[in-house]
Amino acid sequence: YQEALRMESEGINVLKLNTGNPGRFGFKLPNSVRQALALHIDEAVPYCDVRGMAAARNVICTYHIGRGLQGIMPNDVFICNGVSEAASMLLNALIGTGDEILLPSPCYSLWSNNAYLCGGKPVFYRCDPANEWNPDIEDIKSKITDRTKAILVINPNNPTGAVYSKEVLLAIAEIARQHHLVLLADEIYDRLVMDGLRHESIGALAPDVPCVT
């Protein structure tokens, strides 16, 4: 990181594959969001329900029902300060000392760092560059132990940009089903999909498997 900063200071163009910030690449807030913020700024409150504002949770719930999630209610929704806070809260609740979580490789480092902070162990499964960075299903199976608690799926993936097919997601869900694991779905970029591809929500594909998205 320090070396990259030094290179930038010398005018060298550094391509950042670690930056999970679409705003750096020209993606801005939609005008509808900006207008709503400006219109309601005087109604802002310093604190609300610990899970987030009820109106916002209702809208989020409706959005995910429209994406195919079943059985979700507004009380199931927690609004966090980005994926970072969500991951910290989730892993602190889910894993303890020595527990393992399966993470894709390459992976957004937030997840492995939080696993370590919780006393857990990140175990990386391979995403094959020769196969458009898709998860290696057999490698996932081989990494499961009696300490495995969950499988993380980052889709669309950060940093590779891969968008997983329904077949790949169903295969991962089946592994979680067979081994009684929790599915963790980092889908923060679900609408940042290009090239005619379509994002599929793994929670919608496997409603019988515990999933946090």
Model-derived segments and spans:
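Active-site phosphate-binding strand-loop segment of PLP-dependent enzymes
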Residues: 123, 128-199, 203
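N-terminal small-domain helix-loop-helix segment of the aminotransferase-like
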Residues: 1-82, 89
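Conserved PLP-anchoring active-site segment centered on the Schiff-base-forming lysine
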Residues: 93-115
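Active-site PLP attachment segment
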Residues: 204-213
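A short helix-loop-beta submotif of the ANL/AMP-binding
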Residues: 117-123
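Helix C-cap/helix->beta junction micro-motif
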Residues: 10, 118, 178-179, 209
